[in-house]
């Protein structure tokens, strides 16, 4: 038993096992960086859900993890599963939106009808063993790509074919590039183009994107998250929007951005929305800069990042669940009920428009949420 978030609550921590070695090697993730598989995270959530059911207790799940990989639409496996769990009575899920807004790891593409192709430039520093890029386009858009090396050698346009794959080794750079085309998801059929650069040479790499069948001409590219590459890799013309990490894009999950309480300013690295489907994310922002709290080995530490904001938000959700379910003020309560309650009570500045891609519906205000119930 612990005290602090509510009068009395029980804390359950699930330790995830590290990802398999062959996956680290495939995605070029350094050994020193913690990384976990999506299916293991889903198993952890399932375990907590079963445990809460056995004990007939409300459950707040805090996920302070994120990824730039995977489907950003409604077909992502982890996001879909969290939505299912969050719809259940006495369940609430909170996720951080990530710290990728200023990492220059997102490119927002737009091909006009009169354009033959659009060029996307990627800067790669020296001694990079490899990296990958995921390009996503919502159905019915279809694209094909070609790649130019820093010395000007060109991998010609690889024609689109679902399930098609091509590999090419650049002569001077000795960089191996593989390109895979996929149509993903059970409901949407969005296009994924996966580009993997092995033994990546230093310099500016150019990816030319060719329209095959377009309506809007919109597409997005993402590089791996910070620390998931062994050096600095970024888009020269990056875009800070649509940088919410998975599963912060899940519809039923309470997605928390971050801000600095000391000056009221946005935490600049806080992931920004909206989602690719236009859904408002983040839902709101919580303190994320120099947050003081318990750490390992019975010590208190200072933390910065949206993971800290998610932890604070999870505590607020526990307070609301205690008020509603334990004290029986609102016995039918789910993640959506808590989210709407916090959104209605959020503090909103007069000089900003809402909903906002950076701030969502404002900043977390638990007192304001309860005050709103009195009106």
Question: Which ranges hold each PLM region?
Answer:
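Single conserved hydrophobic/aromatic residue that forms the stacking wall/gate
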Residues: 1-9
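Hydrolase catalytic cores
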Residues: 13-19, 52-55, 142-143, 205, ...
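Catalytic cores of secreted or luminal carbohydrate-active enzymes
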Residues: 61, 78-108, 364-366
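Edge beta-strands of jelly-roll/beta-sandwich modules across compartments, strongly enriched
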Residues: 215-226
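Short acidic, glycine-rich surface-loop motifs adjacent to enzyme active sites
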Residues: 14-15, 45-73, 96-97, 212
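Extracellular S/T/G-rich loop segment that most often corresponds to the catalytic His/Ser-adjacent loop
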Residues: 103-192, 209-210, 236-318
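C-terminal subdomain of the subtilisin-like protease fold in secreted/lumenal serine endopeptidases
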Residues: 22, 29, 58-60, 65, ...
